[in-house]
Amino acid sequence: MIDRLRQQVSVCELCNLHKTRVNPVFDKGNSNAILMICGMVPAHDENMQGVPFVGRAGKLLDKILVAAGLTYDDVYITNLVKCFVAAGQSLEKHWVESCRPYLTKQINIIKPHVIITLGADSSRSLCDLAGNMPMKNMRGRILHYSRNTMIVPTYHPSYLLRKGGVKSEQYIEVLEDFNLAKKCLKEMIKMATYT
């Protein structure tokens, strides 16, 4: 099922981003994972390789995963938007809406218990949060996506890079959020065994 969806994304022309992409960026990690990570948009390196989180932000995400005691076998990684958006370009609502059915299908196929959303845009989109609530007010909480899936919003690694990377205050907060996601995951697994 996930391979069929990946193929659909590879030929997608629902918005104008397909004209400037080199490769659509679909996923990375374990498609059987119960922990999903959802970023925002592919950057240049991701566009070139067709894989999410392979650039500088990806290298920082690697460090975050290690610090949180996770590997790529533990997580499934995707983005809100599947095609390259140039640095500094504002995320347009119709791009998100064009990709939303793909992300929804990914979530329905993977069936994660917890989704860690990286960045304000992916957090707002998946949590249906309106307005401009800052990430500092979203993070550190568990939000409901569906009956069987929770969301833990946190900062995007690219934001951390602008704030000083692993030396930033926000890096510690991201680790707290990843640990919150792991704790939530354990609770959901425990609840599932009793139902």
Could you describe each region identified by the protein language model?
Residues 1-195:
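A polyanion-binding, active-site-adjacent surface
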